[in-house]
């Protein structure tokens, strides 16, 4: 008897260890912010000339359009990223699908509902329908539907899309939804070839509906859904349906594309706005407590506090109250990483939203541990990017709808035009951070005065001014800044520097 109990306990303990290890690897692939579990570039890369990108090809559907950026361009291949922009019209449904690589979605405008179907999670949403026959209400029939959680999203939301997890989006608003998707091709979750593959569960991408915007040849992403590849007989047997229904699943004669129009709208069970806010607040508090406990007890996240079924999949980054840095005369900066948004541990990406006021300037910086994909939402910004050779690899104005890839460690300087600017930067690390050259907590502030004075051949007084000119400003700087000392940085150092 004792032997039997011990045997059962041993099996249970082994299973627990296996689950612990797998969940830890899944949700915490890297605890070191200086290291990213990406596979790296698949080729030797030279970032000696950057450019602002716009979508290269469009695929039109019944209720929307998907626009593809040029994935064959060297900059996308070297950074291991893939980008699309998607527009979903009111009552438009982006049919369920999954991809081989993880990504994040930024909602530029609009609102709607979405679902992520995590494998093995229970159907916690239940609703009843009443269906009437053509003969009248006397023969009405009630049926019950159960499904996984439905999430509401709105403008300014960041949505996480794990690899291999089916998802759908629906526009239940009055205006089109515009969203930009950024995928990480080099993520270790991808064990296929180094490119994005989309597996449709319904609908299709019709090749005849494709339209190249600028005439260049890029990779085709058209195809049928996965059911079209199965035999009708085996499919009908596996799903317990007849052959006619099986053929409908294959969508062989469906010309609506991947974004379809729902004539009378979807009947979805959704929590009220108050319930959503209460749930989000409780979830945020729970995650902060869990993160604090993890920091106190262990540097590693064991993966058991959070799982697929309860993890938060969206967060709003546009809310001014969430800003990490705010200057009333210059603008605000808001970032989300895996500490604020734990599912990013699985995605291994993060995001920063910047709102610069008229003529405001961003402190020069470089991305320490990630590439950055900057998408201009509104306004315009002058951007300069410098390589390790001190060469200007980009100097231009970034306009709404344009995308700029900034390689890791390349120095960046940005200044808003007269109308100001707003942009989102998606980064290839779950805990991306930057190193600023000026302002509070900057490189200059951290250097000793004598190091600065001798390095640039300036006086100690000038070095002190260089270190402290921006006072307590951090990130976004006020425009038309007045110099606090006379020009002379290019002159020979004064005798004070050699004392």
From Swiss-Prot:
**Which ranges carry the Cupin type-1 domain?**
50-247, 315-464
InterPro entries, from UniProt? 11S_seedstore_CS (IPR022379), 11S_seedstore_pln (IPR006044), Cupin_1 (IPR006045), RmlC-like_jellyroll (IPR014710), RmlC_Cupin_sf (IPR011051), Seed_Storage-Functional (IPR050253)
GO BP annotations, alphabetical order: seed development
- Pfam families named in the record: Cupin_1 (PF00190)
Similarity comment: Belongs to the 11S seed storage protein (globulins) family.
Q: Which PANTHER family match?
A: 12S SEED STORAGE PROTEIN CRB, OS03G0336100 PROTEIN-RELATED
Main function: Seed storage protein.
State the name under which the record lists this protein. Answer: Glutelin type-B 1
- Please give the organism: Oryza sativa subsp. japonica
Gene that this polypeptide is encoded by: GluB1-A
